[in-house]
Amino acid sequence: LPSEKAPGSQNGFDNSGRKGPIAWQQGNTVTQTVDAFRALAERYLSESDVVAAIEALNEPNIPGGVSEAGLRDYYNQIVDVVRQINPDTSVFLSDGFLSTEAWNGFKTGDDVVMDTHHYVMFDNHLISLDINGHVKSTCDFGKQIKGSDKPVVVGEWTGAVTDCTKHLNGKDVPTRYQGEYANNPKYGDCGDRSQGSVADLSDQERTNTRRFIEAQLDAYEGKNGWLFWTWKTEGAPGWDMQDLLANGVFPSPLTDRKFPNQCA
């Protein structure tokens, strides 16, 4: 069960409920968040056959200005709340856009799980890579998370390698991939990547997407697992797991690999 939004915005992203400056940790916003979290936990954590874990807060943005010390204090409060309500529930802690190893020694052995999100389209270097580069980068990331002293779940990832999906960067915000965003260089044309089905992509692009997905499965299962983002969307090639499965681009069963041992 994720906690996507906090008063004031914990990351400045539109999916926090408010796009713009980060104001979480100002005034009484942390207290409000703890109170809201407690109400959520009291409502759902008794349903242990449904909710096995709960996240303290989605994507607090430390590089963007969230205080790391303040976030650690908030995490301590949240773990205490969960232990009071249902001590058998695991608590997911976002890495705050730091490396998972940066959290070594914090709450280790206290039934907490590090949650890291891995996207390539928001990074100017990663978005420029070809499929071989994406596979190598993914496998390198899989090796990196093994350095954590706690369980690590890659709680968000996708099959897309560009930011071409409509409104991905925000409503009516242009793309990095086509060189329209913040003076980025142009890496290519979006074409059919903006909306629709993965079936509309070329055979080569579908093959590359399958290869990228399989590399991520190998990398993330080398630690403690993953959650794909997302199960169903309104026409976003690479992001829609139902669509990927229906078109043979996501392995089914998961052991059905066309590109085995890419991270060996």
Model-assigned labels for residue ranges:
Residues 1-6, 15-53, 81:
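An active-site-proximal structural segment forming one wall of the substrate-binding cleft
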Residues 3, 54, 93-97, 224-235:
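Acidic carboxylate-rich catalytic motifs and surrounding loops in phosphoryl-/glycosyl-chemistry enzymes
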Residues 6-25, 168-179, 244:
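Aromatic- and acidic-residue-enriched segments that line the glycan-binding/catalytic groove
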Residues 7-17, 29-32, 50, 100-101, ...:
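Eukaryotic short linear interaction motifs
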Residues 46, 52, 59-214:
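Extracellular glycoside hydrolase catalytic/binding regions
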Residues 191-264:
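Aromatic-rich peripheral "rim/lid" segments of glycoside hydrolase catalytic domains that contact
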